[in-house]
Regions:
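Bacterial Sec-dependent N-terminal signal peptides
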Residues: 1-22
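Catalytic Zn2+-binding segment of zinc metalloproteases
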Residues: 372-385
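Short, hydrophobic/aromatic-enriched beta-strand segments in well-ordered soluble domains
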Residues: 50-52, 56, 69, 154-168, ...
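Glycine/proline-rich low-complexity spacer/linker segments in large multi-domain proteins
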Residues: 77-92, 163-217
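N-terminal, polar/Ser/Thr-rich
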Residues: 18-47
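A surface-exposed beta-strand-loop module
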Residues: 55, 61, 94-97, 101-180, ...
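Hydrophobic helix-coil surface modules that form long, contiguous segments used
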Residues: 191-199, 207-369
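Surface-exposed beta-strand/loop patches in extracellular or lumenal glycoproteins
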Residues: 53-73, 81-89, 98-117, 204-209, ...
Length: 388
């Protein structure tokens, strides 16, 4: 009898513990980035450095790590290019359609990009704890053989230099969009791949959704002073930058001899970093529920300014709705940035096309804003579970 009682107590304790901590074996990696880059707005080329503190919270010893090099997809012969040429239903934004002898032909826009139009991201000087590591690039994936295996529950620091070129805007990221936005900087930096209970998710980039590692970002972007930026995170030097970010009553003047500004953003606990920029952006800011700053960055186009102005209080209403329907938005800013080729969610921001009617603007903003909960808080693997 005592044995039976003892077993029941153990079993009950196990059930109680499971209720308190329903997934006691759960772990996730952490990637904390520090990046500095300079953008040449004439050539659309950029150079930068990255310091990544990577924490291995798994029970596995890692001998290799993998990074995404997303811009490499925008090159003739890339996996994304070949896919566009071989599937039956390619994205219409990514192809050209014409007729040859009365037969419709679909051609990948990537296949005709010239060297100064392609995207690329080149990595050099990759080090682990100050020692050069062996690297190999295959398409959009960088494979790194570690100098020293990364043990479970330990961390290490990786440093690298990167040299990139922004591709012609074909899908999501790119330069000179169809609406004239200069820079849609999404999936632009060397980004460590996710490692979870399934292993490495070093999926080649073919223009679809992404899966990322939680972490903190500290990013400094140096660019021509006439460009206004919207981005993931919080601008740290707003009274130095101006461009509509400065505190009320602060007047910001940049000396004539100043050619560039360095924008400093910090983003806590996100799994991506995106930004958009143009030298003809208007920037409006309103305060939403719980003091959340809502930023709106859009082209100074008289035909659409009224729609963008009228959309702003509607966005504040959307924030309140999602707060009540789902749960409080955990950050203190959200930016709606004109850019890209449709609409896509990123951490603390979205890039959307801006030449829309008011109902369309509100609709696409509602859709993308919802992703702030159902991707950028839950961090689901949309590469694997596309329905999510």
């Amino acid at each position: 009898m005592k044995k039976i009682v003892g077993l029941l107590i153990i079993a009950f304790s196990g059930v109680l513990n499971a209720q308190i901590n329903p997934n006691p074996g759960y772990w996730q990696q952490q990637a904390d980035y520090k990046m500095e880059l300079s953008m040449d707005v004439k050539t659309f080329q950029y150079k930068g450095t990255q310091v990544l503190e990577y924490t291995n919270n798994s029970n596995d010893t890692l001998k290799k790590v993998f990074y995404h090099l997303f811009p490499n997809a925008f090159q003739p012969g890339s996996e994304m290019d070949i896919r566009l040429q071989t599937i039956t239903d390619p994205d219409k934004r990514m192809i050209k359609t014409f007729k040859v002898e009365d037969k419709e032909v679909k051609e990948s826009r990537i296949s005709n990009l010239k060297p100064d139009q392609i995207g690329y991201l080149k990595i050099s000087n990759f080090k682990q704890e100050g020692t050069l590591a062996t690297i190999k690039v295959v398409g959009t994936i960088l494979e790194v053989t570690l100098v020293k295996p990364l043990l479970p529950k330990s961390k290490t620091t990786f440093t690298l230099d990167f040299d990139g070129q922004v591709p012609e805007q074909i899908r999501r990221s790119g330069r000179n969009s169809s609406e004239g936005v200069a820079l849609s900087m999404t999936q632009w930096y060397p980004k460590i791949c996710e490692f979870d209970f399934e292993g490495w998710h070093a999926d080649p980039y073919i223009g679809r959704e992404f899966h990322g590692v939680w972490g903190n970002y500290d990013v400094k972007i140096t660019i021509d002073k006439t460009y206004t930026l919207g981005a993931t995170g919080y601008l740290q030097n707003k009274n130095e930058i101006g461009h509509g970010y400065q505190e009320e009553g602060v007047e910001v003047k940049h000396p004539k001899k100043t050619k560039t500004l360095t924008w400093h953003f910090v983003a806590p606990m996100v799994h991506d970093f995106a930004w958009g920029a143009d030298n003809n952006f208007l920037h409006d800011k309103i305060i939403g529920e719980n003091g959340v700053e809502l930023h709106f960055l859009y082209k100074n186009d008289p035909e659409y300014i009224k729609n963008w102005k009228d959309m702003q209080p509607k966005t504040a209403e959307l924030l309140s709705f999602f707060n009540k329907a789902i749960g409080p938005y955990p950050y203190q800013q959200y930016s709606v940035i004109q850019g890209g080729d449709g609409g896509m969610e990123y951490a603390m921001c979205t890039l959307i096309t801006g030449k829309r009617s008011l109902p369309s603007l509100v609709g696409v903003t509602a859709h993308e804003m919802a992703h702030s909960w159902f991707q950028h808080i839950l961090a689901t693997n949309e590469s694997k579970h596309e329905w999510m």
